[in-house]
Amino acid sequence: MSLKIVVLAKQVPDTRNVGKDAMTPEGTVNRAALPAIFNPEDLNALEQALRLKEQNPDSTVHILTMGPPRATEVIREGLYRGADGGYLLTDRAFAGADTLATSYALAQAIKKIGVPDIVLGGRQAIDGDTAQVGPQVAQKLDLNQVTYVTSVDEVKDGKVVVTRHIDGGIERVEAPMPILLTVNGNAAPCRPRNAKLVMKYKRASAPMERPAEGLPYAEEYDKKPYLTIAQWSVADVDGDLAQCGLAGSPTKVKAVQNIVFKAKESKRLTGSDADVESLVKELLDSHTIG
């Protein structure tokens, strides 16, 4: 059977390179000051989507992301790996969204796309670590949902069979479509870019990124429709401004503090009985042990 699949993906700050300017005074992430990457667990979700596409002829995979214009890089990365297209939600009114406002915007976009058979997304984004957006989108769209998925094993008779991680082990679950699945980081890693697809889609862009008329490559977008990445605003997805961005975000950050890790004084032990006895006493006194 053919499947209509949407992958929720996010461009996130690389938290391995966080500096003193990582946060704004308002308590939101200063994305301009941090290098951006494809959210790791969203890549795991993309791989599951691409495997389903291979197993079910005539299926399609589209990437949906919300962010500034540079977030189209996430969609291009998906195209380079085998996705069929993408949608960029970009509007100043989306800025500063918490999980509630983010899930509202994504749900509105999915309604515009047409509710797919399967929505896939990473368990959580590394910039927030909430694991809330996927379940919230499912709730807003009244979709079945399974979280902490490690593999999508089978699609049959309008149902999906998945393996999911639970406390103390794994669980095999069957659930009817349409369905939203959130995928763990211990699922199969995403395949690398395909060189032919990189050459095909390297100039894929949203209208906001387009070169001016008369510049090199500008005419390609008329001749090659597949290079166009759909770009939607709040109005395009029939969104309510009161539920978008900061206006629709009840989560408020009380304070932000930059923490600088400094090397502490070290102590060298010789291994003598006296040193070991002294160390044990120190650990007991500090309640580290005992």
Where are the predicted features?
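N-terminal glycine-rich FAD/FM-binding segment characteristic of electron-transfer flavoproteins
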Residues: M1-G290
